[in-house]
Each structure stands twice: as C-alpha cells, then as structure tokens.
Amino acid sequence: MAERRKIKTEKGLALVPGANKLSDGYNFVLEVPEGSNASLVLYKKRARKPFVEIPFTEENRTGNMYALAIPDFKSEDYEYNFMVDGKVYTDPCAYRILGRERFGAAADSDPHKVRCGFLKNEVFDWENDRNPQVPYYEMVLYKLHVRGYTKANRSIRGVKGTFQALEEMIPYWKELGINTIELMPAYEFMESGIASDPTTAGMVSEKRTEGRVNFWGYIPGYYFAPKRSYCATDDPEKEFKTLIKKLHQAGIACIMEMYFPKESNPVVTLRALQFWKLYYHVDGFHVLGEGVPTELLMHDAILSDTKLMFHDFNEDQVIRKKNPAGKCIAQYNPGFLQDMRCFLKSDEDMVGAAAYR
C-alpha cells in the first residue's frame, strides 16, 4: 500500500485508447466489456515483477471505456500492462511491445514477460522528408516480407531480417526500377502460441497446433507498434523512421499491409492508419480482412492524399479527381501475380490464363 500511495491518479479522458502523453502526465485508456474489472499494472523498467497495480473505478468509466490519468508521470522509468478480470492483458493500442525480441519464440509462461512501452519523447530529424507521390499508373511495386526477404541474403552486412537490412537493398531496387515497396505485416503480432509439451516432442499429430509459428502475420495484431523482432536495434521507432526516410530520399514509396479481422473496431482501424501516416510517414496501405471499414477510411480527411488499396469497395463511394496523380483509392487485384507465378513454374493449363492477363 505504501507503493500504491506513491502514484497519484486522476480521472482520465476516454477518447484515445492506449497510453498517451498529456501536457502534465499520461492518460491510460482501455475498452473493457460490461461487468468486467480492470486495472493498470506498472513495472519499473526491466523489473520482473509489477511495481504497482492501480484499479480502475466507476469514476474512471465512460460507457465501456476506462480512463485514468497520472500527473507528472515519467514514462522513461516505467513499462505497463492492463489486468482484466485477473488476467494480464497487453494493450492492443500500445506503441511498443516488449518481451518479443526473438522471432518465433514460444510465449513465456510468465504473463508479465510481455508488456508495453511508451513512445519516446525524442525529436527525429526527418531532413525535410517528402512523400514521393508515385501515381498508380507509374507504380512498379515490389512486395516483400521484412524477415524473409533478407534473412538468407549473403550480401547483407548488417543484421539480416530487419528494417535496417532493407536499407541495404535500396540500390538494388533502384537498379530494377522499383519505385514502391509493399511490406507484409510489419507491426507487432504474436507469431507463436504457448510452448509445446516437451514430452511429446517429435510425435506426429494432425491436431497439434502448439509451437507452430505464423510466419506471415495475417492475424490480429498490435497495430501501432513496429514488430520488435524485425529490428536490429533496441529502438523500433527510430529504425523504422530511418528506413522510411532513406526510401523517400531514393524516390521510393512505402505501402504497408494491414490485416483487420471481422471483429476489429473500425475507429481503432482508422486511427492506426492515421498514426502510421503521421508518425512514420508511410505513403499508403493495402488493407485486408473482413473488418475493413472501407467507407470510413475513404472519407477520412487525414488519409485523403494517402494510397488506400482494397480488395473490394463500392465505386460509387469514391470521389474521382481530374488529376490522375490525385487518385488514391485502388482495387488490389492479385490475379495477375498468382497466374504469372503459376505460369513461370510451368503449372498445367496456365498458358491461357497468362495470355488473358
């Protein structure tokens, strides 16, 4: 209780989910199902056990949102999680996820191992960064997986499979004539489940799912945090910003794939895209999944000059501009890519399909 009294709290503002800086402190906001109990768990930086747990009260509730403010909060000294009905809950709107530095590592049995970090209050020198503004009719797009693309590349001098390693590929892309790259999910996602039972290791079972790794990332994710295991440094924000800056200096745009399942909150989806555009200077998004609020994204003023690629949308919703370079909405049709892959592999009955494309 002595530790509890060290943390002064106030009622927060239930507008923006996650942990966000105020003029004189930090605001913590969490959506909680009706009837559930929740609390904020704070850890001293790199400490194994929680420093303090602060319950949300009815005073902190607005609808299904809990909001709690901590004045004079020094975020550089802390990490955090939430607790919902007695279980540790990692903030889905966290800007940094800690404890997932090694790709494919099984989830730790300690629920406090994975936790959330805060945005750094450091100024990044963008050096007058500008969006390349590559129109669709001039786009030569190169799609890649951040880890898989450079992991086996012997020419990479730095840490392979990282954002930093992609910087070394820029001269190669320029030589190919590439002016846009598309990153498969590069935000944080939990690629591994719980650790598999060592007593059954090596046994074949069609029903076995433990220990498998989701390499691609087309699952629900932490949409505001660059994937930590794709980083060569311990500063994901700076590393990703540096990649974008160097791409732009070379005249190459960056499109991010974002996957949203059916149950996704459309407001969080919109805010995630706005955040990557404003904070990381991303040029556009290939938005996938059954939970895509297409109309909401297309009519957002912040995203009005941002490339948005959907697999399907109502064309009547699109505001067509006279300047072709200003057309930002596109239908992403992978048919050509799939047919040509099969044709180049000499799959059967692909000559007609390739000719049609």
Language model region names:
Residues M1-G25, P50-E53, N60-H145, T150-R157, ...:
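The feature marks proteins involved in alpha-glucan
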Residues L30, L144, L183, Y223, ...:
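Conserved, mostly hydrophobic/aromatic
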Residues Y80, V84-D129, E191-P226, A250, ...:
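Core domains of carbohydrate- and sulfate-ester-processing enzymes
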Residues V140-Y142, I181-L183, C254-M256, F285, ...:
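Hydrophobic faces of well-ordered beta-strands that scaffold small-molecule active sites
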